[in-house]
Amino acid sequence: MVGVIGTDYPMEKLAPLKAKGVDMSGVEIAEGESFRWRARYRHDLNSAETLETRLGVFSHFRPKIPAAFVDSPFVFLGNIDPRLQLDVLRQVTRPRLVACDTMNFWIESRRPDLLELLGHVDLITINDAEARQLTEESNLVK
């Protein structure tokens, strides 16, 4: 796992991951507030209305992939700025599968970067509303 958390993050929340053997050596702790996203989901959970996005320590984060992770066969790019997701991909060597997540905030604010990223991934995880926003199509069945 590679990422950043702020000094406000409750460290006890990492314990279950560590107990399951997750290598946390790529998680940085930076001075400041952790990323926050607040939303309201509709009844079907296929669309969310973003109420608040606070980037916090993500706004200055530059991922550094530990040497032990560079040749990972599977890479999941979590929901962060697509420019950072691309930076992560430049630091790994030939993964067999690359998946990414994104959200309406990045689709709206970093669309060109996100489209560039999508040329390098095998799988994207988004909900129906994000798919409509990304494709600019209302009919997802097409």
Model-flagged regions — what are they?
Residues R54-H60, T102-S109:
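Short gly/ser/thr-rich secondary-structure transition/capping motifs
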Residues F74-F76, A99, T125:
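Structural motif
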Residues G6-D8, N79-L84, M103-I107:
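Short beta->alpha connector loops
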Residues T93-L97, N104-K142:
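Conserved phosphate/ATP/ADP-binding segment of small-molecule kinases
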Residues T50, L86, L134-E137:
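Glycine/threonine-rich flexible loop motifs
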Residues K13, L84-Q91, P112-E116:
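A short acidic, amphipathic alpha-helical/loop segment
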Residues M1-F76, R90-P95:
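Conserved N-terminal subdomain of the carbohydrate kinase-like
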